[in-house]
Design a protein with these regions (language model features):
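Surface-exposed or secretory-pathway low-complexity segments enriched in glycine-proline
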Residues: 440-481, 506
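A short beta-strand micro-motif common to beta-rich folds, especially ectodomain repeats
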Residues: 486-500
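Right-handed parallel beta-helix
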Residues: 94, 99, 120-131, 147-163, ...
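Extracellular calcium-associated, cysteine-rich motifs in secreted modular proteins
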Residues: 370-432
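Acidic Gly/Asp/Thr-rich repetitive segments characteristic of extracellular carbohydrate-active
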Residues: 30-75, 553-559
Length: 588
């Protein structure tokens, strides 16, 4: 079955209670239309004020650190690039971090961890968090949610932490870790002890949806908590999902895909006694043959035998959207992590898409093999669109929506309970495009379905709101035409099907303007790094000890030359004395 995200008529649903894992009615809408799981009804900074991050400094006015030092804020970014921090950054309660507003290739936080310790009601979207080995503490996590509750993390890349990429532990019932969702995120390349995620809290709740755990020795995740683990993928792990504990917890482990990479050697699923487990539809691929052709997998018990449930312990598993394991692989490799990809994530996704041929467990940033910026790669800055009243919404969006570009009206409540700036950041956080009214605009559906490109995808379009949608003769271009005299938000649905019986259904959100499109803004196709990235030239070593190859983002070997390749992003791989070195190459 296909899965649909973000249908606006289905935005409001019941909230999840914090006790007895039940549900209660909610007057507020979801954190954002695609929000799922225990953290779905977090409100973040809704109703507070807007804070602009205006520089890449470690601290001071306009810095990210200052932005999250007080609660009741929606944080937007007027700059893109890398923020190097010297110490941990503490995020306060009642905050929305809208990383999708950053121009260019977005924002990356390097040099230290982010922490939500003892805080609550937080939304974090489109943020790259990469401490590296020179962080202030060798035991730093990337994102630490200790003693936190009611947090949702979406479309983030959490990598290169010396302890765990994700931390979320508590031994205190007064500050239990609960009401957490992590979705659509990339959790990769932990260094030091090389652990993916350590989650531990008695009576806590945690949901994982559509995430990728990549190049990680162990704890992918280690969940000593009541959890829902649905439609995630693991690649190149030595130990996968684990629950090594004597304390009783409930686990729903459904339709996940586990694929061995060069380091893979253990069963994916390690359970102990005293655990209650519902496991269904999970797949494992051990053959490293470059194809997604795994087999059904059952529970592997590490110490003792737990209770195997006949149905899910939590209703989220039965009521939420769900893909088959293979379709989840295709979706996650199409849209998870921070979009557009920067150099590090381009390398990680290339390794994933080789399906067993590439990838390594790394001990340092340099071990990844990137040859740009001392191994860190680059994150292109870009330029923010004009925002005359500094309310966080650019003028082009306010004009399209009929708002006042000379008045700070960001927190004015709109339909379905969202405030106006949430309308903007929710549009920007989805697959989206812009169009002038009464003018057709084409959208290349391949740009948001990369994971399906190896299985001869077939597309269909339907359910246009405030306009019409047609699939063009090439089979992948969707042409949207808005209604006459309409401006504001429109949308259409698309479905992609692979020849391996995989399928996904999603929506593209369309902003229809009254006048010509403001060229200073980037839509989801123009934000794609394969189009916007300008790379420096580089020289390949040419001696007998060096093996060179050019690969596309799906891991396919293309030869030794880029001369006849079409426009796009490629990986150049050099094997020098047994060590892989990489360069992200973009052909304009």
């Amino acid at each position: 079955m296909g899965m649909e995200f973000g249908f606006r008529k289905k935005i409001v649903r019941s909230a999840l209670a914090l006790t007895a894992f039940g549900v209660v009615a909610a007057a507020e809408p979801l954190a954002f239309p695609e929000a799922l799981g225990f953290g779905a009804n977090v409100t973040g900074g809704r109703g507070g004020s807007v804070y602009h991050v205006t520089n890449l400094n470690d601290d001071g006015a306009g810095s990210f650190r200052d932005a999250v030092s007080q609660g009741n804020r929606i944080v937007v970014f007027d700059v893109g690039g890398i923020i190097n921090i010297k110490t941990a950054v503490s995020i306060k309660s009642n905050i929305t971090i809208a990383g999708q507003t950053a121009p260019g290739e977005g924002i990356a936080i390097h040099g230290g961890k982010l922490s939500t310790g003892k805080q609550s009601n937080i939304i974090i979207r489109y943020l790259r968090i990469r401490p590296g080995e020179k962080t202030a503490s060798e035991k730093d996590d990337g994102l630490n949610l200790y003693d936190s509750k009611n947090v949702i993390v979406d479309h983030c890349s959490v990598e290169l932490a010396p302890w765990n990429n994700f931390g979320g532990s508590s031994d205190n019932k007064d500050y239990r870790v609960t009401g957490i969702t992590v979705q659509n995120s990339l959790i990769a390349n932990p260094i030091g002890q090389q652990f993916g995620a350590h989650i531990e809290s008695v009576d806590g709740t945690w949901a994982w949806y559509y995430n990728a755990f990549v190049n990680s020795h162990n704890r992918n995740p280690l969940d000593k908590i009541n959890d829902v683990f649905v439609n995630n993928i693991l690649y190149n792990f030595e130990a996968g999902y684990t629950t090594h504990t004597s304390t009783h917890f409930n686990h729903d482990i459904v339709n996940n895909y586990f694929v061995y990479g060069p380091a893979g050697k253990n069963e994916w699923f390690q359970m102990d006694k005293n655990q209650s487990i519902y496991a269904s539809g999970n797949m494992i691929d051990k053959n490293r043959d470059g194809k997604l052709n795994g087999e059904s997998s059952s529970i592997y018990y590490y110490q003792g035998v737990g209770e195997e449930l006949s149905k899910p312990w939590n209703e989220l598993t039965t009521t939420g959207p769900m893909l088959s394991a293979a379709s989840a692989w295709r979706y996650v490799t199409s849209q998870s992590g921070v979009l557009p990809y920067d150099d590090i994530d381009s390398l990680v996704w290339y390794q994933v898409n080789t399906l067993g041929k590439a990838g390594a467990l790394v001990k340092s940033v340099a071990d990844m093999g990137l040859k740009t910026n001392n191994g860190w790669g680059v994150v292109l800055a870009g330029e923010a669109a004009k925002d005359s009243d500094k309310d966080g919404m650019p003028d082009y969006f306010e004009n399209a929506m009929g708002y006042d570009v000379g008045k700070d009206d960001a927190m004015t409540k709109e339909s379905y309970g969202y405030v106006r700036i949430e309308k903007y950041i929710n549009w920007l956080g989805a697959s989206h495009m812009q169009i002038s009214d009464e003018t057709s605009r084409d959208f290349d559906l391949r740009s948001i379905t990369r994971g399906f490109q190896t299985v001869s995808p077939k597309y269909s379009v339907s359910a246009a709101e405030n306009g019409t949608i047609e699939l063009q003769n090439d089979g992948y271009t969707a042409r949207f035409t808005p209604k006459t005299n309409f401006k504001g938000l429109a949308s259409f649905k698309y479905t992609v099907k692979g020849n391996d019986n995989t399928e996904y259904t999603g929506r593209v959100e369309v902003l229809v303007e009254k006048s010509a499109v403001d060229t200073t803004v980037q839509d989801s196709t123009k934000r794609d790094s394969s189009i916007t990235h300008i790379t420096d030239s580089f020289r390949l070593r040419a001696d007998a000890a060096v093996m060179i190859g050019v690969f596309d983002m799906n891991g396919h070997y293309l030869g030794l030359s880029t001369q006849n390749l079409p426009k796009g992003r490629y990986i150049v791989r050099q094997k020098i004395q047994g060590r892989d070195e990489y360069k992200v190459f973009v052909k304009k």
